[in-house]
Amino acid sequence: MKLFVGLGNPGKEYEQTRHNAGFMVIDELAKRWNISFQTTKFHGMMASTVIFGEKVALCKPLTYMNLSGECVRPLMDYYHIDVDDVIVIYDDLDLPPGKIRLRMKGSSGGHNGIKSLIHHLGTQEFKRVRIGIGRPANGQKITDYVLGRFTKEESDAVMEAILRAADACEKAVVTPFLQVMNEFNA
């Protein structure tokens, strides 16, 4: 089973914020695949189906961003999902709004949700789809920025990136991730 994990924060107040770009991609995939989420005992929302002949699961941790690993590790253990079958989708300050970047592995880059996953999974070697949200201007605090909503100028580019990231995830269901990475990072 492939597990797609979108990082974000639960609750209405965080919907459509920069930090919830991962949730937005997962929601787009659920819409495309016509599946609904159920709350799990692992402190997350999960939906699963068979797509292109492969079992897939979508996960939105409800632990808040900084504790995402507390949801994902037990879920992986329960369903016997190998780290090679996990793809994590999240926001990235170091990419401009609307840009996506796929990676096979890497450090947290200062992202607390990724730090939590690295800690709980015991490895940095999991696949990622990063959604660019850009950096704050005018000395705005990073916390306020990532928890803020996209500006009108950013919105179209980011929504296009959400769709493109969902396309990459769909392709990764049956295509080797390195090949998907080469195509979508071009």
UniProtKB/Swiss-Prot annotation:
Its EC number is 3.1.1.29. One of its GO terms (biological process) is protein quality control for misfolded or incompletely synthesized proteins. Disulfide bonds: none annotated. It comes from Geobacillus sp. (strain WCH70). It is an enzyme of class 3 (hydrolase). This is Peptidyl-tRNA hydrolase. GO terms for cellular component: cytoplasm. One of its GO terms (molecular function) is peptidyl-tRNA hydrolase activity. Belongs to the PTH family. SUPFAM superfamilies: Peptidyl-tRNA hydrolase-like.
